[in-house]
Amino acid sequence: MIKTSALNKSLNLLMIVLLSIALHSCGANSGAARSSYQSTTISYYANKFNGKKTASGDVYKHFKMTAAHKTLSFGTKVEIINIANSKKVQVTINDRGPLKSGRAFDLSQGAFKKIGNLNDGILKVKYKVLR
C-alpha cells in the first residue's frame, strides 16, 4: 500500500513537470514567431486560379487579401512588408503552397498590388505571424 502511494505521487509529479515543460515550450515558440520578422521571397497567383477552390475550401478571388503557405493554419493572419518600399499588407492564409522553392508565400493579386507591382513577379519581403 505504501509503495503504491509513493509510485502514484511520483507519477503525478512527473506528469506535472512534463506538462509544464510542454506548455512553456509552446508559449515560447509562439511568442518568438510573433515578435520577430523573417525574410523570404514571394510571388502571386496566376490568373488561371481566379474562381477556383483553395485547399481550405474558399473560392480564390484576386481582390481578396489572402495567401498560400505550406504549413501555417488556415485563418492565420500574416503581416508582409516589401523590403524595397516598406509598404505592408495583412493577409489571411487560406491555401497551400507555394510550389516554387525558396518562396514562403503566394499572395492574391490584390494583396501583391498593395505592396508591389505585378510586373515585378516576385518580391523580397519580411513577414511576421500576427495571430
Cite the ranges covered by each PLM segment.
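Secreted/periplasmic proteins
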Residues: I2-L13, L19-R131
